[in-house]
C-alpha cells in the first residue's frame, strides 16, 4: 500500500533470543487449576495452527469487527509474512509445537540481561515460568505436511 518495499529487521536475527508473546497467569491458578491452564494453553496453540494453516475466515471476521481498519487483504498479507518469517511456527515449535519454550533459551536471555545490567545475577528467573503446559506437540498434526 505504501508503494515501497520495507526493510525488515527481525530482532531474533540480531541475537534477541527472548519470546515475544507469552501466556501469563497467576501461580495460584497453575497450582489450584492446572487442568484449566493446560486446556487454555492447548486451545490457544490449536487456535494458532488453525488460524495460520486452516480456514481463518471466522477469526478474521472477529478481528475486523473489533478492528474496522483491517481488511481481508491486510490479514492475508499478515498471515503470509508470519509464515515466511517463521514468526509463530519455527525453531523449537517445529518439533515441540507452537508455544514451545526451553530452559536454555530462557537462561540465554537472562544471561544477556545480566550482562547488560538490566537484571541482577542473583535473581531466580526460574520462578517466573514453567514448562509444565508446553512442548507436548499439541496441534502439530494440524500443520500441513511438506
Language model regions located:
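Secondary-structure end/capping motifs
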Residues: 31-118
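Extracytoplasmic ligand-binding site segments that recognize negatively charged/polar headgroups
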Residues: 9-24
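Ligand-binding "clamshell"
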Residues: 1-11, 70-77
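A bilobed periplasmic-binding-protein/Venus flytrap-type ligand-binding module shared by bacterial periplasmic
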Residues: 20-35
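Short secondary-structure boundary/hinge segments and terminal tails
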Residues: 16-18, 81, 130-132
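Short, structured secondary-structure boundary patches
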Residues: 12, 28-30, 140-146
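Conserved C-terminal helix/tail region of periplasmic/extracytoplasmic solute-binding proteins
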Residues: 106-146
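Ligand-binding pocket segment of bilobal, Venus flytrap-like solute-binding proteins
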Residues: 1, 26, 65
Amino acid at each position: 500500500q505504501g508503494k515501497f518495499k520495507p526493510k525488515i529487521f527481525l530482532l531474533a536475527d540480531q541475537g534477541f533470543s527472548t519470546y515475544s508473546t507469552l501466556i501469563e497467569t497467576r501461580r495460584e491458578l497453575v497450582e489450584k487449576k492446572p487442568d484449566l491452564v493446560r486446556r487454555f494453553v492447548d486451545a490457544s496453540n490449536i487456535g494458532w495452527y488453525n488460524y495460520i494453516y486452516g480456514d481463518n475466515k471466522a477469526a478474521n471476521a472477529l478481528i475486523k469487527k473489533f478492528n474496522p481498519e483491517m481488511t481481508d487483504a491486510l490479514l492475508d498479507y499478515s498471515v503470509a509474512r508470519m509464515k515466511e518469517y517463521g514468526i509463530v511456527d519455527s525453531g523449537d515449535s517445529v518439533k515441540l509445537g507452537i508455544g514451545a519454550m526451553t530452559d536454555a533459551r530462557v537462561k540465554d536471555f537472562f544471561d544477556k540481561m545480566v550482562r547488560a545490567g538490566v537484571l541482577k545475577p542473583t535473581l531466580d528467573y526460574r520462578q517466573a515460568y514453567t514448562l509444565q503446559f508446553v512442548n507436548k506437540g499439541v496441534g502439530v498434526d494440524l500443520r500441513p505436511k511438506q
